[in-house]
């Protein structure tokens, strides 16, 4: 009987040790998450203290060449700082961050009228939309809808897409020879349109978002499911004029950040539409990224 019970005891010990290891692993994961939250809070505390003491409205974008880089409200990254504050409030529950998030969000009010580039979705989505979704700020709804109207003015019906950048004479975009450039980043702005339809009941925004997603699905991707950065269109006919990059290494390379814009963008489009094609494309982009032989072991891709 003792010999027979020995394997049972070993098995029981293994289960107990496995449970202990599992608990320790979960606790370690919690510690990592909390450590990161604490670090973010410390950095944001330092930065908001600097800004508040300055008496100015400053919008930090990045730390570069030994100093903080602040940007005007029409910069495409202007919504990221208030967005970070909203997430910090959500993670900590500290009302201090709610107050600061609202303050820096509402400094961007005039962005709702911005029509000269497509990134109003980034700017208002990260700030006002997060305020609504994370904190129930109902008073932000009109700003979100107005911003969607502004973004919709960039829709080129003949091509079925939202034009990303203007090509005014003298701009670097014009010097590239583009007519109606659309960048993969634009997929990120569609969430603003989907939300505007949900909030207003006006399907115009939804239809523009779907048209843009479908046209991008058709033209932006290579056979291996990597994507180009820039597709240049004839805005009247939808003819593809150029397949280029603006920030990648070369036209036929897969710019790392752009692949993630595509992955997030089509996952988000599936969430709003339940169109299986979008989910399938997101999976294909995921497979391209994570099965790529040049992806480093730390999973941080080269530029």
Q: Which role does the model predict for each range below?
A:
Residues 26-303:
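Glycan-recognition and catalytic cores of secretory/periplasmic carbohydrate-active enzymes
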Residues 1-31:
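Bacterial Sec-dependent N-terminal signal peptides
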């Amino acid at each position: 009987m003792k010999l027979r019970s020995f394997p049972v005891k070993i098995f029981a010990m293994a289960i107990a040790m496995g449970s202990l290891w599992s608990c320790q692993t979960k606790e370690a994961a919690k510690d990592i998450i909390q450590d990161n939250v604490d670090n973010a809070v410390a950095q944001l505390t330092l930065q908001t203290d600097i800004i508040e003491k300055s008496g100015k409205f400053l919008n930090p974008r990045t730390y570069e060449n030994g100093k903080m880089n602040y940007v005007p409200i029409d910069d495409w990254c202007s919504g990221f700082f208030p967005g970070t504050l909203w997430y910090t409030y959500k993670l900590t529950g500290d009302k201090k961050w709610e107050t600061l998030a609202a303050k820096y969000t509402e400094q961007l009010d005039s962005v709702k009228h911005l029509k000269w580039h497509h990134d109003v979705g980034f700017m208002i989505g990260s700030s006002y939309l997060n305020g609504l979704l994370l904190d129930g700020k109902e008073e932000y709804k009109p700003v979100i809808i107005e911003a969607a109207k502004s973004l919709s003015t960039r829709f080129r019906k003949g091509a079925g897409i939202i034009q990303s950048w203007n090509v005014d004479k003298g701009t670097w975009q014009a010097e590239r020879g583009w007519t109606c450039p659309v960048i993969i980043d634009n997929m990120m702005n569609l969430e603003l349109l989907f939300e505007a339809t949900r909030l207003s009941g006006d399907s115009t925004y939804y239809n523009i978002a779907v048209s843009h997603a479908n046209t991008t699905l058709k033209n932006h991707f290579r056979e291996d499911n990597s994507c180009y950065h820039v597709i240049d269109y004839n805005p009247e006919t939808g003819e593809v004029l150029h397949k280029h990059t603006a920030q990648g290494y070369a036209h036929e390379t897969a710019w790392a950040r752009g692949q993630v814009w595509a992955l997030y963008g089509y996952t988000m489009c599936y969430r709003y539409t339940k169109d299986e094609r979008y989910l399938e494309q997101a999976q294909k982009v995921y497979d391209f990224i994570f099965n790529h032989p040049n992806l480093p072991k730390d999973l941080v891709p080269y530029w």
